[in-house]
């Protein structure tokens, strides 16, 4: 992981200057018509449009797969989902769209920066706001259309060093415990973090930490942890870059948040990971040290309540549901967006 630090810091520097705007709200005739229809009316048009064929969906969420199965069960419309990681997903979509090839009807994506620059700006993906959502969803969540909010949070294994009881408490209280050096009091070594070069929302998270709001939070947390004011260093543009560099040097990479969640639940006490909170649903209901159970995990942002983790306890991001400009089945795509944003 250490060799990625200079590259990641440089990437953060570039991204910080091009934060996503409110997004495009481009539509075609089918989408403009679909926005006037109720969900029931959309489903009726979708059935007529698709017939016995199959709608194509691309996404990177296991929750999308479950939503699609439920949608098919409810409507009878067949849907095929291709699940890929961020990098492959954007690459395959871009390649197909650039060659004007059909690949998908609906797409579920995270990472607002790449969505804007690679998909919305060239009009490869179009925005559809369901009639029901237009009445009930905040405007900021409709352009582009947000399907769901997700949280990535710090978690740690709460067993004591003997592995006999859940007695480890208030273990992570300040984010500088995850940076700094091993000589720092309360230092936590080897927190697990999905590599930002393959998980775009993690890169966006690091970029966020270089902005004034989070620089201010990190500065306060630094003083609370080290009991002294932060003095600017020539090696870093600001304290956000310092935390990022030290955190990445101290952390270990994992390839899957779901696997990391399971590994943390089964690991020794004090093991820390930053993962998608939703992944706890996949843990087995096993009891005891070294077993895969949510009871083995503590989430500092919840544990500390109003006190919160000094600095931050994780971050929140959106996933967006979009319709392909060259969709074969645009009404079906719109019906699926409507289902995901209101029923799934």
Which positions does each model-derived feature cover?
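Periplasmic-binding protein-like
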Residues: 134-137, 148-153, 241-247, 292-325
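Bacterial lipoprotein signal-peptidase II cleavage site
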Residues: 18-27
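A ligand-binding cleft/hinge motif common to bilobed small-molecule-binding domains
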Residues: 112-118, 265, 271-302
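Extracytoplasmic ligand-binding site segments that recognize negatively charged/polar headgroups
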Residues: 55-69, 80-94, 102-262
């Amino acid at each position: 992981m250490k060799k990625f630090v200079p590259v990641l810091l440089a990437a953060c520097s570039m991204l910080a200057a091009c934060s996503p705007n409110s997004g495009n709200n481009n539509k075609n005739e089918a989408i403009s018509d679909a926005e006037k229809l109720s969900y029931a009316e959309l489903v009726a048009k979708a059935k007529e449009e698709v017939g016995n064929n199959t709608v194509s969906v691309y996404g990177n969420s296991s929750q999308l797969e479950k939503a699609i199965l439920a949608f098919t069960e409810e409507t009878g419309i067949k849907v095929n989902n291709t699940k890929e990681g961020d990098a492959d997903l954007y690459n395959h979509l871009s390649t197909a769209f650039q060659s004007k090839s059909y690949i998908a009807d609906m797409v579920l994506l995270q990472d607002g920066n790449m969505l804007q620059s690679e998909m919305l700006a060239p009009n490869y993906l179009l925005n559809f706001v369901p009639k029901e959502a237009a009445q009930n969803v905040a405007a900021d969540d409709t352009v582009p259309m947000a399907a769901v909010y997700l949280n990535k949070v710090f978690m740690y294994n709460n067993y004591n060093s003997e592995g006999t009881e859940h007695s480890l408490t208030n273990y992570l209280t300040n984010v500088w415990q995850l940076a700094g050096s091993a000589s720092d009091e309360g230092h936590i070594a080897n927190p697990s973090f999905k590599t930002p070069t393959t998980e775009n929302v993690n890169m966006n998270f690091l970029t966020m930490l270089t902005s004034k709001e989070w620089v201010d939070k990190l500065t306060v947390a630094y003083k609370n942890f080290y009991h002294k004011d932060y003095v600017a260093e020539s090696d870093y543009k600001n304290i956000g870059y310092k935390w990022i560099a030290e955190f990445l040097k101290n952390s270990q990479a994992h390839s899957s948040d779901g696997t990391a969640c399971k590994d943390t639940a089964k690991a020794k006490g004090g093991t820390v990971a930053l993962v998608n909170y939703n992944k706890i649903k996949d843990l087995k209901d096993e009891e005891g040290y070294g077993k895969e159970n949510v009871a083995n995990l503590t989430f500092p942002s919840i544990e500390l309540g109003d006190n919160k983790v000094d600095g931050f306890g994780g971050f929140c991001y959106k996933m967006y549901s979009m319709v392909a400009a060259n969709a074969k089945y645009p009404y079906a795509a719109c019906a699926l967006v409507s289902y995901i944003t209101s029923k799934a």
